Regions:
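Structured loop/turn residues at beta-strand edges in well-structured enzyme cores
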Residues: 32, 69, 103, 165, ...
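Glycine/Thr-rich phosphate-binding loops of Rossmann-like dinucleotide-binding domains
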Residues: 47, 118, 207
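Active-site acidic/histidine proton-transfer and metal-coordination neighborhood
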Residues: 24, 63-67, 81-169
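Charged helix-capping and loop-helix junction motifs
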Residues: 20, 52-58, 86-94, 122-131, ...
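Hydrophobic faces of well-ordered beta-strands that scaffold small-molecule active sites
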Residues: 1-4, 10-11, 37-39, 71-76, ...
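Acidic/histidine-rich catalytic cores of soluble enzymes
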Residues: 74, 128-215
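N-terminal pre-domain/capping segments
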Residues: 1-101
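Active-site-proximal loop/turn and secondary-structure-junction residues that shape catalytic pockets
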Residues: 3-7, 41-43, 77-80, 112-116, ...
Length: 217
């Protein structure tokens, strides 16, 4: 489960870091049978997020071991409000990958939305910074997983252009159905390029709903 989803979030806020209660989520996850938490770095840089300090990383490791959890993914929401086309943002990703490697993280999730929205028209612009980030991740044995609004065919084109073995795809069931994509067709097309899955459901108004009550089949 994604970090922050086991704590009551502020009104209207779905993706957030539970600043005052982040440690408790690890024990809650263990108690309800969840075996791992996907860590997040926020849309605005937060120096108090434990991912940014060695002391914080030690705390995370201790909590994971104490609660018998796994730890293999980190999502960098920072690029949602800060364009990856900016050199400083690319460097933020590289710094975060180095921190993630200290935790043994295997997957680095990059959500290409809003300020970093990646489309068929602009994908050439993103190749250089994306390759730069992915090459750093490769050094640390980390796969970079791209979450985008692209269709399956457009994603295949992007992966061919990037042409790096550690660049893969995030398949988010809710987002895919919200954009009218062919879920089954895309899954068959992307096949082994799907490295990470976010399972959620959405209704016709693009609202998150309980699994099984929306448009995802």
């Amino acid at each position: 489960i994604v970090q922050g989803r086991l704590t009551q979030s502020p009104p209207g806020c779905l993706q957030w870091f539970p600043q005052d209660d982040w440690q408790n989520e690890f024990s809650i996850a263990s108690e309800i049978g969840i075996d791992y938490i996907e860590l997040i770095a926020e849309v605005q840089h937060n120096t108090n997020n434990p991912i940014w300090t060695d002391e914080g990383i030690s705390q995370i490791k201790e909590l994971v071991e104490k609660n018998n959890l796994n730890l293999h993914a980190l999502c960098n929401d920072y690029i949602i409000k800060n364009s990856l086309l900016d050199e400083s943002v690319a460097q933020q990703n590289i710094s975060l990958i180095k921190q993630a490697s200290k935790l043994g993280v295997e997957k680095f999730i990059m959500p290409f939305f809003e300020s970093s929205e990646l489309s068929q028209k602009n994908m050439q612009n993103f190749l250089q910074p994306l390759k730069k980030v992915a090459k750093e991740a490769y050094v640390h044995n980390i796969n970079v997983c791209l979450e985008t609004i692209l269709t399956g065919h457009e994603l295949i084109k992007l992966l061919d252009l990037v042409d790096l073995p550690n660049v893969k795809v995030v398949y988010d069931t809710g987002n895919r159905v919200a954009f009218g994509h062919d879920l089954a067709g895309d899954i068959r097309l992307l096949d082994g390029n799907i490295e990470h899955v976010h399972i959620k459901d959405k209704n016709q108004n693009n609202e998150n709903v309980l699994l099984g009550t929306g448009l995802v089949n």
